[in-house]
């Protein structure tokens, strides 16, 4: 009996310590996210150039728009593909009109800092912010402006709403669009003040051409309208005249609406907005939820957010809308949070969660861009750059952006994961995504083992035309560590890799083709997206002639150009054929 019991214990321990397995199959010809560079957006706090009570900067910038010396080595080379503004400023009454004008020191004071600093002129204002984005190489079309939606003439139910309120809010928002986008030719589309002329006098004669405008920040929060459908109806009532006013100034802009992150079902903000007159009349461009996952709860895990957002992205696509992830970061549910609570969201634990989240988001072909919350204030609760005890630190979650941005190539492609479940009951232990260059000459695979206990054996399939160039593991010594360790690794005899718990495997491949194949491929190569398609299938280049057939080889339609309308095709499998290519796609009505 004792022998049998000992054998049972040995078998049990061997199972507990068994190495888990994960397999990834890649289809480089099937695009998921058309521009995966937009995974690396950030939200920027408009108060970043203001001074604290001791007269020193509380943010990243001096009032003149230069980075403070301590921030230069941390942030001057930081990768930013898209940005959201004014961040936390919107919650404390930031007024863009008071943030423009020269000299900057003569601008009216704004009280935006609470106990962090006195009322003062916002010298690093809207124009200075736009100059910074230009210096970073960003197009104004990749700036996402958050506008206040509360009018100070109304007595709002909550002091948080009242704190955001500004005078004559409808005109205020319309004036901002005119200042940003109207040509300086006397057209003055809003009448009254010629804001384009004022912009020109402030040193920027040409219109910025900002496309993305979001209505509010988190209007679904309990201290604003609340997460009920009645709250959503109130939100829609408030923003409709604002939307009409700003579209009258510039009909080409793209308007996004905030929505509750994890609402599911028919009686939700998601459903209410998607079925609203604003959506039906084409006045809005997309929905913009926020995500603050934590792995400690069953409904707050990254996997839960990815599942919900996958469904939401598909629902948006059915209504002809996009999804933009306004903000995300590791959640900090503790109230009030300790310094350790704040830090771990930015340390290695928060980094693993963030990479897991980004890999999940990269597979949503109707997701346009993602922003991290929040940059600009190193003493804030969420601080990817931290100021503590007189020291500025680039936290691991920000270090990881610097490491991953060059590796996330032009498109994410279809990556099918088969992973053992996590030791905590998560549906997977390892999450993987793959990224290719425009001409398919490069392929990078990023696999994150988000499990805190299990090691995984990892295998990649679908890469027979690629040669491995580099392989490394990114890891740390503990969830609260702030140093990222890079280790060069090699596959085992079977071509498999080992991914330790809470670590990231990066594989870099180059295409293995001869010179003739290389030239031929560059000439003939193109990609199709989204796949599955609903109403339209896009091509990454203009085609002189193409034919669409069903899976029996029967011709369904033909044409030329950079897209094909697919709304009238029945759900199923189809093939797009050109002289040199044949690509499979699905219709998913």
Language model features with spans:
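Solvent-exposed beta-hairpin/edge-strand motifs
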Residues: 462-483
């Amino acid at each position: 009996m004792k022998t049998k019991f000992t054998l049972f214990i040995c078998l049990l321990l061997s199972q507990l310590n068994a190495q888990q397995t994960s397999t990834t199959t890649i289809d480089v010809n099937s695009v998921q996210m058309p521009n995966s560079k937009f995974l690396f957006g950030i939200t920027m706090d408009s108060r970043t150039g203001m001074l604290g009570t001791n007269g020193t900067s509380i943010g990243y910038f001096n009032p003149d728009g230069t980075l403070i010396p301590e921030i230069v080595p941390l942030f001057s080379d930081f990768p930013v593909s898209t940005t959201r503004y004014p961040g936390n400023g919107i919650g404390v009454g930031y007024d863009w009109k008071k943030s423009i004008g020269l000299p900057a020191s003569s601008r009216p004071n704004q009280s935006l800092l609470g106990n962090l600093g006195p009322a003062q002129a916002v010298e690093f204002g809207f124009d200075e912010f736009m100059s910074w984005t230009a210096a970073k190489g960003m197009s104004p079309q990749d700036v996402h402006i958050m506008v206040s939606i509360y009018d100070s003439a109304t007595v709002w139910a909550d002091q948080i709403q009242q704190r955001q309120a500004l005078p004559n809010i409808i005109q205020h928002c319309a004036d901002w669009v005119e200042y940003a986008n109207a040509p300086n030719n006397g057209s003055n589309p809003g009448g009254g003040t010629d804001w384009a002329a004022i912009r020109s006098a402030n040193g920027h004669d040409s219109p910025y051409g900002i496309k993305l405008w979001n209505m509010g920040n988190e209007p679904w929060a309990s201290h604003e309208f609340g997460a009920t459908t009645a709250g959503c109806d109130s939100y829609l009532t408030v923003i409709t005249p604002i939307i009409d006013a700003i579209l009258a100034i510039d009909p080409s802009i793209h308007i996004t609406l905030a929505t509750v992150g994890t609402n599911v079902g028919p009686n939700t903000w998601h459903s209410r907005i998607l079925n609203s007159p604003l959506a039906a009349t084409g006045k809005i461009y997309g929905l913009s939820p926020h995500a603050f996952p934590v792995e400690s709860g069953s409904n707050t895990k990254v996997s839960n957010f990815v599942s919900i957002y996958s469904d939401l992205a598909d629902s948006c696509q059915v209504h002809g809308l996009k999804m933009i992830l306004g903000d995300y970061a590791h959640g900090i549910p503790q109230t009030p949070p300790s310094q350790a609570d704040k830090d771990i969201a930015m340390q290695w634990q928060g980094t693993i969660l963030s990479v897991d989240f980004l890999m999940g988001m990269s597979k949503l072909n109707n997701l346009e861009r993602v922003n991290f919350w929040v940059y600009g204030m190193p003493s804030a609760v969420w601080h990817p750059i931290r100021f503590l005890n007189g020291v500025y630190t680039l936290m691991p979650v920000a270090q990881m952006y610097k490491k991953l941005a060059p590796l996330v190539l032009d498109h994410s492609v279809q990556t099918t994961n088969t992973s053992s479940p996590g030791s905590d009951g998560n549906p997977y232990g390892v999450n993987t995504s793959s990224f290719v260059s425009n001409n398919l000459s490069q392929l990078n695979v990023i696999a994150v083992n988000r499990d805190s206990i299990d090691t995984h054996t990892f295998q990649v399939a679908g890469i027979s035309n690629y040669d491995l160039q580099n392989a490394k593991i990114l890891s740390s010594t503990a969830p609260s560590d702030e140093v990222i360790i890079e280790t060069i690794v090699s596959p085992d005899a079977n071509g498999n890799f080992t991914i330790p718990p809470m670590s990231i495997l990066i594989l870099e491949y180059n295409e293995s083709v001869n010179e003739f194949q290389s030239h031929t491929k560059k000439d003939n190569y193109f990609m199709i997206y989204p796949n599955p398609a609903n109403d339209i299938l896009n091509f990454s280049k203009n085609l002189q002639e193409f034919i669409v057939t069903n899976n029996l080889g029967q011709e369904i339609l033909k044409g030329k150009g950079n897209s094909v309308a697919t709304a009238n095709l029945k759900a199923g499998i189809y093939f797009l054929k050109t002289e040199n290519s044949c690509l499979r796609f699905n219709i998913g009505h």
